[in-house]
Amino acid sequence: MLNKRGVPCRCESDGPPRQNNALSGTTFYVVGCNKAGWNKCRYINAISTCCKEG
């Protein structure tokens, strides 16, 4: 089962893509944002979700 996380991703609150934009989210694969204190901040695709702590 895939449960990898740790790849940075862009949340909706990060604004439009620009060079040197901070990526405040973390990609969760398969399991979604299932950790306490993590919230979905952007849909990526069927097997990964961008989540933000807090």
From Swiss-Prot:
PTM sites of type Glutamic acid 1-amide: 53
SUPFAM superfamilies found in the cross-reference section: Defensin-like
Origin: domain of life: Eukaryota
Disulphide bond pairs: 9-50, 11-41, 33-51
Gene Ontology molecular function: any one: toxin activity
Source species: Epiactis japonica (Sea anemone)
Name this protein carries in UniProt: Toxin AnmTx Cj 1c-1
Family: Belongs to the sea anemone sodium channel inhibitory toxin family. Type I subfamily.
Post-translational modification: Contains 3 disulfide bonds.
Compartments where located: Secreted; Nematocyst
